[in-house]
């Protein structure tokens, strides 16, 4: 049976609310028409009511702490109170892990880095009421070279994914076209959230969620990225 983009989108935005139940989300197969939007943010947390009033299906939230040099990221990490409020409003919440950025990127230490970051992702996801059997996205917020992928990113993702699998979760990857393409070839990940940096205007056919560059909105005073 073929899967529509709508079904894939819903699968990538499974509720984190405590006690959430449902069948295991299907693996993403192909891009189709986008029939909804989901937001991500870090500077603060818009209310569930404001998100719903803006017409979005939910939010992708950080299961990672703020960096010491980024205390402005008041929206990190996601909390149980937030996911409960989202669920009560009929909104979905998905999880993504990203602590470092650029010269402090989580993937720079390869598999050893996953040993540090994967347990944190799992712990914060659980603390926010996140069920097993759901994807946690791993961020590759860069435009890496093939050499960086082979030497650092692939080992990082494989080790992180292994930890997620062992804990009962699925693997999502946040990256550009090339990262997704390389991951698909290597069998890493079931869900793919694509950003446009270095993607050359292309959308990978295995994309589950697409974060289009410079597509933002202010909701409840918080700047949010809009994803389809």
Give the ranges of each region predicted by the language model.
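C-terminal region of N-terminal signal peptides and the immediate post-cleavage residues
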Residues: 19-33
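Structural recognition of the beta-strand scaffold that forms the well-ordered cores
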Residues: 38-40, 58-62, 93-97, 134-139, ...
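Substrate-binding cleft of extracellular glycoside hydrolase catalytic domains
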Residues: 43-46, 61-145
């Amino acid at each position: 049976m073929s899967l529509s983009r709508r079904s894939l989108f819903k699968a990538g935005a499974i509720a984190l609310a405590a006690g959430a139940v449902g069948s295991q989300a299907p693996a993403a197969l192909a891009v189709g028409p986008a029939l909804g939007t989901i937001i991500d943010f870090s500077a603060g947390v818009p209310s569930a009511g404001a998100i719903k009033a803006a017409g979005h299906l939910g939010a992708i939230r950080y299961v990672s702490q703020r960096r010491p040099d980024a205390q402005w990221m008041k929206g990190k990490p996601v909390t149980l109170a937030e996911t409960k409020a989202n669920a009560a409003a009929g909104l979905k919440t998905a999880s993504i892990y990203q602590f470092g950025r650029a010269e402090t990127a989580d993937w720079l230490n390869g598999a050893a880095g996953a040993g540090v970051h994967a347990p944190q992702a799992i712990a914060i996801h659980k603390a926010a009421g996140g069920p097993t059997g759901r994807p946690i996205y791993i961020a590759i917020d860069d435009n890496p070279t093939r050499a960086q992928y082979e030497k650092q990113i692939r080992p990082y993702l494989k080790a992180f994914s292994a930890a997620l699998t062992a804990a009962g979760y699925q693997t999502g990857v946040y990256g550009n076209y090339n990262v997704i393409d390389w991951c698909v070839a290597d069998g890493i990940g079931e869900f793919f959230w694509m950003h446009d940096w270095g993607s050359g205007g292309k959308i990978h056919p295995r994309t589950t969620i697409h974060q289009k560059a410079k597509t933002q909105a202010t909701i409840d005073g918080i700047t949010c990225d809009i994803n389809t």
